[in-house]
């Protein structure tokens, strides 16, 4: 658990302005991407986890909405983020 919280804090420091800046769009997108990547690996082993798959789709939808917001308001930050996280636009 300690490793996980340290990874989250590192992501917040990397994409936010400070370690307390957990609410910014960039940080939320980075954290959602981390969770989505974990769940994608989970579904390789657990193909019939339909409830978890619904949660994954909700996370992808939330990330898409945040990316759309970032694209319309902070385009340079949007381009930096999708390049850094390896996302398509």
From Swiss-Prot:
GO MF, one annotated term: structural constituent of ribosome
UniProt KW Phosphoprotein keyword: no
Keyword tags: Ribonucleoprotein, Ribosomal protein, RNA-binding, rRNA-binding
Cellular component, GO annotation: cytosolic small ribosomal subunit
Xref: InterPro entries: Ribosomal_uS15, Ribosomal_uS15_bac-type, uS15_NS1_RNA-bd_sf
GO biological process, any: translation
Pfam families reported for this sequence: Ribosomal_S15
Record field: transmembrane: none
Similarity comment: Belongs to the universal ribosomal protein uS15 family.
Subunit structure: Part of the 30S ribosomal subunit. Forms a bridge to the 50S subunit in the 70S ribosome, contacting the 23S rRNA.
Name of the protein described by the UniProt record: Small ribosomal subunit protein uS15
Gene: rpsO
């Amino acid at each position: 658990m300690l490793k996980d919280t340290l990874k989250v804090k590192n992501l917040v420091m990397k994409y936010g302005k400070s370690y307390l800046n957990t609410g910014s769009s960039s940080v939320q997108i980075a954290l959602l991407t981390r969770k989505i990547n974990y769940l994608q690996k989970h579904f390789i082993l657990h193909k019939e986890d339909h409830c978890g798959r619904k949660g994954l789709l909700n996370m992808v939808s939330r990330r898409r909405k945040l990316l759309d917001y970032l694209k319309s308001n902070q385009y340079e930050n949007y381009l930096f983020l999708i390049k850094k996280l390896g996302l398509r636009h």
